[in-house]
């Protein structure tokens, strides 16, 4: 997305300052992958699934706007919000996904000491400000399984919030 472009431009500026050979820079930029950032995971020949660490409204908006530019059949967003964090963040993320995704699957994402269902209800409050379609599946593994099993040709499914984390 745009943040990756900005980060690459910063890297170019630093390498120029330190006189790193241009071929080294080209090779590195072509090969660099940041685990959990717009990470494509092959699960189907029919649709795309991406993992991204987007865990606030600004980063979720950025990744969804970027992926919409590819004109998917549907843009499906699977995400949750962490517990013991701002409720406002939950409302905002729900609203962003409701506006930009064609379908949202709300799930749990490290609830810490909070009830996962209460967190999901907060996210629903944000989505309810939009016309966005959604379901909630508390168990994250089940939510991901649902997204994959219901993927349609041309869809882009983004698993947002946890990036490379596996807990």
Name these PLM-found stretches.
Residues 33-36, 106, 162-165:
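Residue-level signal for pocket-adjacent positions within structured domains
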Residues 55-56, 81-84, 110-111, 162-167:
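Short glycine-rich anion-binding loops that position phosphate/pyrophosphate groups of nucleotides
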Residues 42, 79, 140, 161-163:
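A general secondary-structure junction signal
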